[in-house]
C-alpha cells in the first residue's frame, strides 16, 4: 500500500514522503497512530502544495533574516558599563545588554540569538555573533565604554 508519511518514521522516511509498505503495517499501525495517510491523488497534490508553501515561507524568512543581518553589520553599538580606572569592568557585558542596545536602534533581536565567544570584562572593541536564522549569522561591532564611577 502506498502511504504519505505525516511524521518522520525512522525505518521508513521523512514527513511528506510517499512510501510503499505492507497493507497490515499501514492499516494496523501507521494510519491509526496518525503517522501516515493513504496516498490518494488528492492527498499527494495537497502534500505537494503544502511543501511549496513551506519552501516559500522558509525562503521569505531567510531573505528577511539576510536583510536584517546586512543592517546589523552596517552599525556599531556602544555599551556603557561601570569600570575601574584600569579599564576592567565591574561584571561583564551580557547578551541582554546587547539586545537592549539593539532595541534602542530599532532592531528586535532576542538575547538567546546573541553569542559572545569569551566574556567581555574590559573596555574596548569587540565582535559579537548574532544567529538570525539557521544559516544566517550577523557580526555586530560592539564598543564597550566606561561610565564614570564615583568612589
Curated annotation (Swiss-Prot):
Highest rank taxon of the organism: Bacteria
Any one of the GO BP annotations: translation
Keywords noted in UniProt: Ribonucleoprotein, Ribosomal protein, RNA-binding, rRNA-binding
Any one GO CC term of the record: ribosome
Any one Gene Ontology molecular-function term assigned to this protein's record: structural constituent of ribosome
Function description: Binds to the 23S rRNA.
NCBIfam families: L9
HAMAP family on file: Ribosomal_bL9
Record-stated family: Belongs to the bacterial ribosomal protein bL9 family.
Protein name: Large ribosomal subunit protein bL9
Organism: Chloroherpeton thalassium (strain ATCC 35110 / GB-78)
